[in-house]
A protein has these predicted regions:
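Carbohydrate-associated surface elements
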Residues: 37, 58
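Short hydrophobic beta-strand element within catalytic cores of glycosyltransferases
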Residues: 179-182
Length: 190
Protein backbone atom coordinates (compact mmCIF):
# COMPACT_ATOMS: atom_id res chain seq x y z
CA UNK A 1 0.00 0.00 0.00
CA UNK A 2 3.04 2.28 0.18
CA UNK A 3 2.58 4.97 -2.45
CA UNK A 4 6.25 5.95 -2.28
CA UNK A 5 7.41 2.59 -3.70
CA UNK A 6 7.71 2.98 -7.46
CA UNK A 7 8.62 0.89 -10.45
CA UNK A 8 8.21 -2.62 -11.76
CA UNK A 9 9.48 -4.25 -8.58
CA UNK A 10 6.55 -3.04 -6.47
CA UNK A 11 4.13 -5.75 -7.66
CA UNK A 12 6.81 -8.44 -7.43
CA UNK A 13 7.60 -7.39 -3.85
CA UNK A 14 3.92 -7.29 -2.88
CA UNK A 15 3.38 -10.78 -4.32
CA UNK A 16 6.41 -12.15 -2.43
CA UNK A 17 5.30 -10.43 0.76
CA UNK A 18 1.84 -12.00 0.51
CA UNK A 19 3.36 -15.46 -0.02
CA UNK A 20 5.69 -15.07 2.97
CA UNK A 21 2.82 -13.75 5.09
CA UNK A 22 0.55 -16.69 4.24
CA UNK A 23 3.33 -19.14 5.08
CA UNK A 24 4.00 -17.44 8.42
CA UNK A 25 0.29 -17.22 9.22
CA UNK A 26 -0.29 -20.89 8.38
CA UNK A 27 2.71 -22.17 10.32
CA UNK A 28 2.57 -19.79 13.29
CA UNK A 29 0.58 -20.55 16.41
CA UNK A 30 0.29 -16.93 17.56
CA UNK A 31 0.67 -13.82 15.40
CA UNK A 32 1.27 -10.62 17.36
CA UNK A 33 0.94 -7.00 16.31
CA UNK A 34 2.01 -3.79 18.01
CA UNK A 35 -1.38 -2.13 17.53
CA UNK A 36 -4.93 -2.89 16.38
CA UNK A 37 -4.67 -1.53 12.85
CA UNK A 38 -1.63 -3.74 12.19
CA UNK A 39 -3.63 -6.72 13.46
CA UNK A 40 -6.46 -5.82 11.08
CA UNK A 41 -3.98 -5.70 8.18
CA UNK A 42 -2.68 -9.16 9.10
CA UNK A 43 -6.24 -10.52 9.07
CA UNK A 44 -6.79 -8.82 5.70
CA UNK A 45 -3.67 -10.60 4.41
CA UNK A 46 -5.10 -13.98 5.40
CA UNK A 47 -4.16 -14.57 9.02
CA UNK A 48 -6.86 -16.50 10.88
CA UNK A 49 -8.41 -14.11 13.42
CA UNK A 50 -8.09 -16.62 16.27
CA UNK A 51 -4.27 -16.60 15.88
CA UNK A 52 -3.97 -12.81 16.23
CA UNK A 53 -3.16 -10.77 19.30
CA UNK A 54 -2.10 -7.19 20.01
CA UNK A 55 0.98 -6.82 22.22
CA UNK A 56 1.80 -3.10 22.41
CA UNK A 57 5.22 -1.69 23.15
CA UNK A 58 5.77 -0.69 26.73
CA UNK A 59 8.11 1.49 28.71
CA UNK A 60 8.83 1.98 32.39
CA UNK A 61 6.96 5.21 33.04
CA UNK A 62 8.59 5.60 36.45
CA UNK A 63 12.00 5.92 34.74
CA UNK A 64 10.85 9.15 33.11
CA UNK A 65 9.32 10.76 36.18
CA UNK A 66 11.22 13.47 38.03
CA UNK A 67 13.79 13.91 35.28
CA UNK A 68 15.98 17.03 35.15
CA UNK A 69 14.32 20.01 33.46
CA UNK A 70 15.61 22.99 31.54
CA UNK A 71 19.09 24.37 32.20
CA UNK A 72 20.55 27.87 32.04
CA UNK A 73 21.66 27.04 28.49
CA UNK A 74 17.98 26.63 27.58
CA UNK A 75 17.02 30.10 28.82
CA UNK A 76 14.82 31.77 26.20
CA UNK A 77 14.89 28.73 23.89
CA UNK A 78 12.05 26.54 22.68
CA UNK A 79 13.66 23.10 22.55
CA UNK A 80 12.34 20.64 19.98
CA UNK A 81 13.62 17.11 20.52
CA UNK A 82 13.82 14.26 18.04
CA UNK A 83 14.81 10.93 19.58
CA UNK A 84 15.62 8.66 16.66
CA UNK A 85 18.18 6.87 14.55
CA UNK A 86 19.44 9.19 11.81
CA UNK A 87 18.26 7.01 8.91
CA UNK A 88 16.16 7.60 5.77
CA UNK A 89 13.08 5.87 7.26
CA UNK A 90 12.99 8.60 9.94
CA UNK A 91 13.02 11.29 7.19
CA UNK A 92 15.38 13.54 9.11
CA UNK A 93 15.94 15.71 6.02
CA UNK A 94 12.29 16.77 5.98
CA UNK A 95 12.56 17.53 9.70
CA UNK A 96 15.63 19.70 9.10
CA UNK A 97 13.98 21.56 6.22
CA UNK A 98 10.79 22.16 8.23
CA UNK A 99 12.85 23.36 11.17
CA UNK A 100 14.72 25.76 8.89
CA UNK A 101 11.45 27.38 7.82
CA UNK A 102 10.16 27.49 11.40
CA UNK A 103 13.44 28.97 12.66
CA UNK A 104 13.01 31.88 10.22
CA UNK A 105 9.69 32.65 11.95
CA UNK A 106 10.87 32.20 15.54
CA UNK A 107 14.54 32.54 16.43
CA UNK A 108 13.98 30.97 19.87
CA UNK A 109 13.68 27.48 18.32
CA UNK A 110 16.42 24.91 18.84
CA UNK A 111 16.35 21.41 17.33
CA UNK A 112 17.96 18.53 19.21
CA UNK A 113 18.44 15.42 17.05
CA UNK A 114 19.21 12.79 19.66
CA UNK A 115 20.29 9.32 18.71
CA UNK A 116 22.85 7.30 16.79
CA UNK A 117 23.86 8.23 13.27
CA UNK A 118 26.37 5.43 12.59
CA UNK A 119 23.81 3.02 11.07
CA UNK A 120 23.74 4.95 7.77
CA UNK A 121 26.76 7.26 7.80
CA UNK A 122 26.15 8.47 4.26
CA UNK A 123 22.61 9.62 5.10
CA UNK A 124 23.83 11.19 8.34
CA UNK A 125 26.50 13.13 6.44
CA UNK A 126 23.80 14.33 4.02
CA UNK A 127 21.79 15.56 7.01
CA UNK A 128 24.82 17.35 8.49
CA UNK A 129 25.49 18.93 5.08
CA UNK A 130 21.85 20.00 4.71
CA UNK A 131 22.05 21.91 7.99
CA UNK A 132 25.24 23.56 6.75
CA UNK A 133 23.91 24.32 3.26
CA UNK A 134 20.70 25.84 4.65
CA UNK A 135 22.78 27.75 7.22
CA UNK A 136 20.40 26.78 10.00
CA UNK A 137 21.59 27.76 13.47
CA UNK A 138 20.63 25.85 16.60
CA UNK A 139 20.56 22.30 15.24
CA UNK A 140 22.36 19.87 17.54
CA UNK A 141 23.20 16.25 16.69
CA UNK A 142 23.95 14.65 20.05
CA UNK A 143 24.65 11.09 18.96
CA UNK A 144 23.60 8.29 21.31
CA UNK A 145 22.32 9.66 24.62
CA UNK A 146 20.60 8.70 27.85
CA UNK A 147 17.07 9.97 27.23
CA UNK A 148 16.66 10.93 30.91
CA UNK A 149 19.44 13.51 30.53
CA UNK A 150 17.70 15.39 27.71
CA UNK A 151 13.95 14.76 27.57
CA UNK A 152 13.15 17.06 30.50
CA UNK A 153 14.79 19.94 28.65
CA UNK A 154 12.47 19.61 25.66
CA UNK A 155 9.34 21.70 25.17
CA UNK A 156 8.03 19.35 22.49
CA UNK A 157 9.25 16.26 20.64
CA UNK A 158 8.97 15.52 16.93
CA UNK A 159 9.00 12.43 14.73
CA UNK A 160 8.90 12.67 10.92
CA UNK A 161 9.12 8.98 10.06
CA UNK A 162 7.71 7.67 6.80
CA UNK A 163 7.04 4.30 8.45
CA UNK A 164 6.61 3.29 12.09
CA UNK A 165 5.09 0.62 14.27
CA UNK A 166 4.49 1.97 17.74
CA UNK A 167 7.40 4.35 18.42
CA UNK A 168 8.96 4.20 21.85
CA UNK A 169 9.96 7.85 21.53
CA UNK A 170 6.29 8.86 21.57
CA UNK A 171 5.59 6.72 24.63
CA UNK A 172 8.65 8.18 26.38
CA UNK A 173 7.58 11.72 25.52
CA UNK A 174 4.11 11.16 26.93
CA UNK A 175 5.56 9.59 30.08
CA UNK A 176 7.65 12.75 30.54
CA UNK A 177 4.55 14.91 29.91
CA UNK A 178 5.89 16.29 26.63
CA UNK A 179 3.64 17.00 23.64
CA UNK A 180 4.49 15.24 20.37
CA UNK A 181 4.38 16.31 16.73
CA UNK A 182 4.40 13.19 14.52
CA UNK A 183 3.61 12.03 11.03
CA UNK A 184 0.44 9.95 10.71
CA UNK A 185 2.08 6.56 10.18
CA UNK A 186 1.83 3.29 12.09
CA UNK A 187 0.42 3.88 15.54
CA UNK A 188 1.65 7.48 15.84
CA UNK A 189 -1.88 8.82 16.11
CA UNK A 190 -2.28 7.14 19.50
Amino acid sequence: KAKWVEGIYKNIWIDQFRKMSKLAYNEGTLITSLFEHARELQIELGCPIEKTMVTPNGIRVENLQNIPGKTEEDEGKINIGAVLRVTPIKDVKTMIQAFGFAKEKDDRLKLWIMGPWEEDREYAEECFQLVSDMEIPDVVFTGRINIRDYLGRMDVTILTSISEGQPLTILESYAAHKPVIATDVGNCYG
